[in-house]
């Protein structure tokens, strides 16, 4: 798989798939990883720790609808070239934690519905997010209804055009840091 540049929809709609061995995939040239695992709603685990995402430009809906995934180790993802992360984790409603602290989103323009319906996430650390190029955050955290803490103090909203439904349904947040001081 080392020469593959487009991995979009590779396992799209594989709704009966319970196990998937992609640990040794060579993703070093992949630019498009959109909808890669979309609708794999029976997968409970997915080992992608070794994925080289350094050339990836789009991750739209990459894990959308992976509703049985209980954990996802993406700590090593290099997201420095990614421009679109919309719906990336949307519908991953069994994930209880997601470590995205190392995500470089400095080139991302669209984060719409990124965590939509991640209804079991309790904490999401987005403090390091450089949102200065982001234009869309529509529904970004909507229906994350178990989320208890969210720190958006470093969010720069100067280029954001649409924030509709951004926090809609986040009914358990008791510590909402930085909402009053979103950078303009």
Question: Each predicted region: which residue ranges?
Answer:
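Negatively charged
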Residues: 1-184
